[in-house]
Amino acid sequence: MSLQVPGDHLLHDAHLAYTVGRLLGMQDNIIVPKLEGYMGSWRRSEIVGTTQNGNILMSDYGHHPNEIRPTLRAIHEKYSDKKIFVVFQPHQYSRTRELLQEFAISFSDADSLLIPDIYFSRDKKEDVEWMTMERLISEIKKHQPNVIDGK
């Protein structure tokens, strides 16, 4: 099976969908073309433009380490001849605090990372005070030295 979307994680999902289809009695000539024609979800590795010199601009809403890692890995594999510059805005101080170590290791497939700020939403004062940009940048730099504080 050959997919339009990159990533072993999506190929794995397609194999699972194929298996479910077969268990439900569907034939290959129905299942396979649909899976091979799948172009991806809105705001997940979505190509939104190309610059004049050929840089590809993508948008991805993944904001959890379990989404970021496989997405960047897939982009790195598909565009191995290109540099990957990521702009990432963590969503919620509390989530960033809770998943700090996971976020720290999530950007190894990026060449550079810019973090503008942490998006405030329903956060408690103690989370905002504890989860500073300096702390986030410091943890990420242990695994991705090319991280920039964008605020």
Show the residue positions of the predicted features.
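C-terminal helical cap/extension that packs against the catalytic core
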Residues: 56, 104-151
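Nucleotide phosphate-binding/pyrophosphate-handling subdomain across enzymes
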Residues: 2-112
